[in-house]
Amino acid sequence: MVHPYLFLNFFRELLHPLGFSEAGADAVVYTWLIMIGLVVLSIAATKRLQAVPSGLQNFMEVIVGGIENMLVETMGEHGKPFFPLVATLALFILVSNLIGLVPGFFPPTANINTTAACAVVVFVTTHIVGVKHHGAGYIKHFLGPIAWLAPMMFFIEVIGHLSRVISLTLRLFGNMNGHELVLIIFFGLAPFIVPLPMMLMGVLVSFIQAFVFMLLAMIYIQGSLEHAH
């Protein structure tokens, strides 16, 4: 699903020979735009660090500090090594959600490939961390406490872990894509006044979806660190 008109529309023509659809090309372009923007923002915020923060540094410290506090409350102090991953995902998803509210911009999270990529990152990280922390004993997470039920529990647990990828992917994609559809319909009916309440709702949805994805990522990683019972 794409906007009626798009900023940086000419990139479609560049990516079309590579086999990208219009929606896929838009997602790639805006994903790179957001990543570059976040890098520039981080450089600008840390270029002249001050003991008493102000301006952009203060704004970014509030955001980053909030994410770090939530991570510590959810995972404990041993969760701090995962802060870069969690914060990066949270900021990328939040900005990706919000950028769709700007007329002519496409939110990458309204493309299922983007949300699937984020979900796979969480899935792979979860199990790499589990294996690294527990070694071969990580398999106990999939076997359950009763030995004779282990084969069945293993199958159930594998399905459960794979379903995490599907749920993370579809929850974010469904909410953002659905919101995009509603916005386009309202913009078609009344371009200036009617969409405003939906845009305000979109801001709320954008924050909630980024928060939920970040929280679930922390919970899944924390689960892989715990000892199996």
UniProtKB/Swiss-Prot annotation:
SUPFAM superfamilies: F1F0 ATP synthase subunit A. It holds the Pfam family ATP-synt_A. The keyword Zinc does not apply. It is a multi-pass membrane protein. The keyword Transmembrane applies. Keywords: ATP synthesis, Cell inner membrane, Cell membrane, CF(0), Hydrogen ion transport, Ion transport, Membrane, Transmembrane, Transmembrane helix, Transport. It is found in: Cell inner membrane. CDD domains: ATP-synt_Fo_a_6. It comes from the Bacteria. Coiled coil: none annotated. InterPro entries: ATP_syn_F0_a_bact/chloroplast (IPR045082), ATP_synth_F0_asu (IPR000568), ATP_synth_F0_asu_AS (IPR023011), F0_ATP_A_sf (IPR035908). The chain crosses the membrane at residues 25-45, 82-102, 104-124, 142-162, 181-201, 202-222. PROSITE patterns: ATPASE_A. GO terms for biological process: proton motive force-driven plasma membrane ATP synthesis. Belongs to the ATPase A chain family. F-type ATPases have 2 components, CF(1) - the catalytic core - and CF(0) - the membrane proton channel. CF(1) has five subunits: alpha(3), beta(3), gamma(1), delta(1), epsilon(1). CF(0) has three main subunits: a(1), b(2) and c(9-12). The alpha and beta chains form an alternating ring which encloses part of the gamma chain. CF(1) is attached to CF(0) by a central stalk formed by the gamma and epsilon chains, while a peripheral stalk is formed by the delta and b chains. Key component of the proton channel; it plays a direct role in the translocation of protons across the membrane. This is ATP synthase subunit a. It comes from Citrifermentans bemidjiense (strain ATCC BAA-1014 / DSM 16622 / JCM 12645 / Bem) (Geobacter bemidjiensis).
